[in-house]
Curated annotation (Swiss-Prot):
Homohexamer. Zn(2+) 2 binds at H65, H326, E329. Zn(2+) 1 binds at H64, D102, E329. One of its GO terms (molecular function) is metal ion binding. GO terms for cellular component: cytoplasm. It comes from the Bacteria. This is GTP cyclohydrolase 1 type 2 homolog. The keyword Iron does not apply.
Amino acid sequence: MKIADLMTLLDHHVPFSTAESWDNVGLLIGDEDVEVTGVLTALDCTLEVVNEAIEKGYNTIISHHPLIFKGVTSLKANGYGLIIRKLIQHDINLIAMHTNLDVNPYGVNMMLAKAMGLKNISIINNQQDVYYKVQTYIPKDNVGPFKDKLSENGLAQEGNYEYCFFESEGRGQFKPVGEANPTIGQIDKIEYVDEVKIEFMIDAYQKSRAEQLIKQYHPYETPVFDFIEIKQTSLYGLGVMAEVDNQMTLEDFAADIKSKLNIPSVRFVGESNQKIKRIAIIGGSGIGYEYQAVQQGADVFVTGDIKHHDALDAKIHGVNLIDINHYSEYVMKEGLKTLLMNRFNTEKINIDVEASTINTDPFQYI
């Protein structure tokens, strides 16, 4: 398997297009044409993680947090530059799966919920997928070759199906005037043509390409075509809603997940004895969604990186919070390893995948 093949597999199951627009995901450092010798999953790509990959003989690291996030202005032998230089010197490929793994139905938030032992887990804050239904009108004799060209260029595909068109027949009319150069008809004379309306679906990113192809292969000088926007609730969303088997107090629940996640500290906002049943989770830094979570029926909102004033606001408004620290996302190391191994086993791909043993939490606890 080459890096390009691994990227295709990852994109199929955890699409990079579902990442936030500000994010930096995908192949950050590497060569798509090299063979994968092994994969190391990590929360952060630190120098220690790079050394671990080198020791194992693995040439691919998949990290959750992007090492390169903003524009790089220099690569010196210190700080982040040292990490990047070492990756390049040892021909190690670095792939980032950040917010695309956050919003995935099997991603970070699902991994956290399962690690906490929760039940009835479902995605919340679902994304909206944008599609377009394209329709254009073409003379009956040109239908076949026109559809062939669209299909050859990747349009009119639905999952594992290609050449997905709908046709309806009708009668078109037009009158060429002035300096027109009509394929059919004569200047200043109304022409009637048996036409077919062709309809097909495209993804949002294909819109400009579809317009280009229609203009290129349609027999008319000025073809008529429409893009009708369709929005559909996506399977992807930022966060999950889940439940404990039996009601428990806020303090007991906080202590329970501290133990199950094996993290050194947990903070919570709310009355210690308040009963908890439904839990909303956004791993990492999810403040800003806490009130929406309550509106969706959550008894407590679990996230990390909660600041003082956000916690105070929540307390004043009666919103229960639990801060499990940003590093709690470390569960993705084993979770992503499992996802990859399942796919590799299904497709009979013999490549080692290991979760990094390096703790990249920058904090020390006393």
